[in-house]
Amino acid sequence: MTVSPLLAKSIKLLPKPARRILNNANDRLFRARDLVLAEQTPFEVIYSNDLVKLRHYLPISQDEIMVDGIPMTVNKNTHKVPLVIVPPLAVNMLIYDLFPERSLVKYFVAQGFEVYLIDWGTPTRKHTHYNLNTYVSEFMPEFLAKVREHSGQKQLSLHGWSMGGIFTLCYTVLTHDTDIRNLVILGTPINSHASGAVGKVYQAIERRAQWVRKNTGFRIHNLNPQWLHTPGWANVVGFKMTNP
């Protein structure tokens, strides 16, 4: 964007914080495409349904990549057991491939793994009938079957972060899938009631919920799921408010 000399002179007279805001706004509006560094690791979508897509990341052709400024040799020997990344619902898949030198999927591919990622998509109000059972008992078996079909391998390693870890654990327990070779669980609550001070809060809420259920018969499961739909921007605001 070309700025007239008069406008440029006026901007220079503004306080420094205001100039920063204008510069950032200019970048976001007119240079957004140039600023995006995420999702540069090549992948192909090998399967999709109405909402969810399955990504397969392609082998790296270079002999060496940079990881946070440090050179790393690319392993050309592929591990036999594919790695399936199971994300939480409330994140953008860009987080796994954020920068060329800070990319989890690129790092795993460079280490010789066949990397797959289940992209949950962006649920809308027409998906409010989906529940935990939908993801654990329907989507997980469906998409892991496609990974096995594409890779030709029965054994899989699952990498679950946050709610993705819950999906991974529930799937493994409920299906008794003996071909899950490894489980990597990050930031996933296993027993929320035992989580220190936060766990005490959960225990108090549970006691009150039991009292309400006992005395009124009310259960939150009986509410219309559309009333509980949370838009993505609300999740963003909530997480930012917890940032110190």
PLM features per residue range, with description:
Residues 127-129, 196:
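Conserved catalytic-core motifs of eukaryotic protein kinase domains, centered on the activation segment
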Residues 39, 45-124:
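Short, surface-exposed "cap/lid" segments of acyl-processing enzymes
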Residues 1-39, 75-76:
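N-terminal targeting or regulatory segments adjacent to alpha/beta-hydrolase or S9 domains
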Residues 2-17, 149, 153, 167-244:
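Alpha/beta-hydrolase-fold enzymes
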Residues 82, 156, 181:
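Conserved acidic residues
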Residues 100-103, 134, 201-202:
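Glycine-rich, phosphate-binding/catalytic loops in enzymes
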Residues 159-168:
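Gly/Ala-rich beta-loop-alpha elbow adjacent to hydrolase catalytic centers
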Residues 130-150:
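Alpha/beta-hydrolase active-site loop
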